[in-house]
Amino acid sequence: MAQQYLPGQRWISDSEAELGLGTILTQDGRMLTVLYPATGETRQYATRSAPLTRVRFVPGDEITHFEGWKMTVREVDDVDGLLVYHGLTAQNEARTLPETQLSNFIQFRLASDRLFAGQIDPLAWFSLRYHTLQHQSAQLQSSLWGLGGVRAQPIAHQLHIAKEVADRIAPRVLLADEVGLGKTIEAGLIIHRQLLSGRASRVLILVPENLQHQWLVEMRRRFNLEVALFDAERFIESDASNPFEDTQLALVSLEWLKEDERAQDAAFAAGWDLLVVDEAHHLVWHPESASAEYRLVEQLAEVIPGVLLLTATPEQLGLDSHFARLRLLDPNRFHDLDAFRAESSSYQPVAEAVQELLDEGRLSQQAHQTIHDFLGAEGEALLAAATDGDIEASSRLIRELLDRHGTGRLLFRNTRAAVQGFPERQLHPYPLPCPAEYMELPLGEHAELYPEVAFQSQQEPADEQNRWWQFDPRVEWLIDTLKMLKKYKVLVICAHAETALDLEDALRVRSGIPATVFHEGMSILERDRAAAYFADEEFGAQVLICSEIGSEGRNFQFSHHLVLFDLPAHPDLLEQRIGRLDRIGQQHTIQLHVPYLETSPQERLFKWYHEALNAFLATCPTGNALQHQFGPRLLPLLEDGDDDTFQGLIDEARAERERLEAELHAGRDRLLELNSGGGEQGTALVDAIEEQDDQFALPIYMEQLFDAFGIDSEDHSENALVLRPSEKMLDASFPLGDDEAVTITYDREQALAREDMQFLTWEHPMVQGGMDLVLSGSMGNTAVALIKNKALKPGTVLLELLFVSEVVAPRALQLSRFLPPLALRCLLDGNGNDLAAKVAFDTLNDQLESVPRASANKFVQAQRDVLATQIAAAEAKIKPRHVERVAEAQRKLKAGLDEELARLVALQAVNPSVRDSEIEALRQQREDGLAALEKAALRLEAIRVLVAG
């Protein structure tokens, strides 16, 4: 045994192939020393059990000299135990290469190379590679790719908008849903799907400073998107010439970017694919002038191909302000305000006619004439059928009208009135006597609304005997209310973090009720833990006390009792508070509990919100406008003023609200709502996601993946597992997300309630990263097994091969939709027959047993010539299937893009919102895609040798 190892021989490690080629240094009978020059590592092995395989190339192999030149082997000599290769270079020059001069960096990655080099993998890894290919192929072709993995309830209008917009090249749209309908989720879905498809690689998100944290939490928690938050400090500390170029997703506050010219220059030059702007209705524009913020966004929109503007509804904005947003998207199309006003007024009668068609099922003479004037003669047949009550004709007629709508492709706007699924609200006011301690407080800084903060600021910090919660009647009321609601989860929101912390103290000291807090001073991890403690049904807190800012971006809809311990100074903040529970999918009526101090400003603010704005029982789209209009008169009356004057203000504001709401309702564009709601397409997406959620394919696959990589999984609770790296963890780069442990769930409902758990879907970075590790490495591309089947004569050899049709092209072409990495499987018997169609992979897999590596290697070396011939024969057999798959991919690409091109060209003829650049980009994508598919190659992915026993 000792004579087989000689200094200078090249061997490769069976267990550490990444070390490259090893060179025998010494061999003293019992111990063997091997140097791996590529990494500078040295290993010592017991001679009798060294996990090494001799590197022996054969004629036809291409080998590399350590200086980098290559040659194809023609002959091999054995000179005193060392191999000497003779062959020809690419220039047909004869060369000799002793094995001592082989490149140290040779790694055997091709399946056939690794098989013949003795690098034979465990059976489980071969199976994992096959299943990884199948699952990846299915996902890349799925219409749900980028839509199904979000930690949110699947909602039809959101999914419809996301798919419609994300599937465009460089989309430029306005997302203008009413409050509470999920504009941020729509934007996140669009970003996520564009990134996964390759349509976008780099995204700039521009938001008001007070929304930065909310966006950060939403992107990370819901979409698993790692967003880099940029501010002045981070920008200055960066060593890069352009700090933005180091990140894929940047989150920037509009206030900071507006003031920092160097950061602006860097943003303009960073080469973004998509710009997302939240609260875009605050960008001020007039025909004569524009604000600095508006001009900044305008300049960015000129250099960034895709733009998403999140804004208030057009009715709330007013026509001029709405025009200002559209100018940012398409300045060539929207350059004349007067022309836009005229165009918009022409759509209103059409929208009213559509409303009549929807309500009555047929058209009056006037409505018929309105639509005829709008469509012209080409729509006459459809119009006649729709007038007679033909339902299918009515649907097609509405689609035709939508296609011609001036902003139908640019603007998506849903209203609560049009979207189903919102809960009702019930208000429970609790007037309480105002304590004497608050009567003497100085006014200012909203002290009249939050007297506990003003009172506590006057006390000594160490004075535990004089705490506001010892006398404030709201605290006693809260304790009694929580006891009464002891079976329910209760969310308490107050304006300040200090109040939230004090309330936790009060509940602990005075009642023992289990509570947890949630405020802006906590880290994201601490907030996750607090939210998880609140969500836990069995052992969790009954009450979660949140500050105003701390609860931004969080979803607590598993609760339906909301205590507003105080009231915010603005109706938008009140709506945000209620919106923590009042969301689509909430199963119960929202119970709003509002304590307030009598004869104090709190009582008047309660009446203002309830009687003037109706802000408790319904969303208040006019709240911001009314606050702006009446705020200067309201504030003095909160502190002082007689009751009659205050009541007069309430009556005036109520009348104005009713007038504005009537205007909004009259201005509703039913055509836009139909386009934005998604109809049957949106419902079909929801059904498909729910069906995917109910399948067990992902948990089964992930257990296989965890076992292969040495990740331990154990039950945590119902529908949840804890993952930990085991002592045998194979690869430290496995994207577990935590070095110690991580809790996961495959259940969407569980994930919505427990944000501390990772929600595993096919799109999750852990799943995608694990699949990438399998397919980018070589592990599992060879195997040798014993097959136990009475129908096979002992000694019979079967060869199972997996091939992949591979196309090298930019991800933005999305060729994986048409030619995904599906495994083309071939199962050859000794006569060269392909049995793959008759014997399924899993059926065969169940009949296999492992073979010791040494025995497997010995068999492979003995059968090398036969196996090499069979591999070549298998490739010849599979080639026609590859050619057929590529041709089918070309047909699908051509048909799909030709149809989309024809639709856009026809649409452009009747709707100027279709850009020339969009059509040209689609034509280019078609040409580039077909050219890339023409070069698709067949690659041998994996080999398994099966010996009947």
From Swiss-Prot:
UniProt subunit comment: Interacts with the RNAP. Has a higher affinity for the core RNAP than for the holoenzyme. Its ATPase activity is stimulated by binding to RNAP.
PANTHER family documented for this protein: DNA ANNEALING HELICASE AND ENDONUCLEASE ZRANB3 FAMILY MEMBER, SWI_SNF-RELATED MATRIX-ASSOCIATED ACTIN-DEPENDENT REGULATOR OF CHROMATIN SUBFAMILY A-LIKE PROTEIN 1
Gene: rapA
Keywords, comma-separated and alphabetical: Activator, ATP-binding, DNA-binding, Helicase, Hydrolase, Nucleotide-binding, Transcription, Transcription regulation
Annotated Helicase C-terminal domain residues: 474-628
Protein name: RNA polymerase-associated protein RapA
DNA-binding as UniProt keyword: yes
Role this protein plays: Transcription regulator that activates transcription by stimulating RNA polymerase (RNAP) recycling in case of stress conditions such as supercoiled DNA or high salt concentrations. Probably acts by releasing the RNAP, when it is trapped or immobilized on tightly supercoiled DNA. Does not activate transcription on linear DNA. Probably not involved in DNA repair.
Alphabetical list of HAMAP family matching this protein: Helicase_RapA
EC number: 3.6.4.-
Family, similarity comment: Belongs to the SNF2/RAD54 helicase family. RapA subfamily.
Keyword Chaperone in record: no
GO molecular function, one term: DNA binding
CDD domains: DEXDc_RapA (cd18011), SF2_C_SNF (cd18793)
Chain positions recorded as ATP binding sites: D177, E178, V179, G180, L181, G182, K183, T184
Highest taxon listed in the record's lineage: Bacteria
PROSITE patterns noted in UniProt: HELICASE_ATP_BIND_1, HELICASE_CTER
Origin species: Stutzerimonas stutzeri (strain A1501)
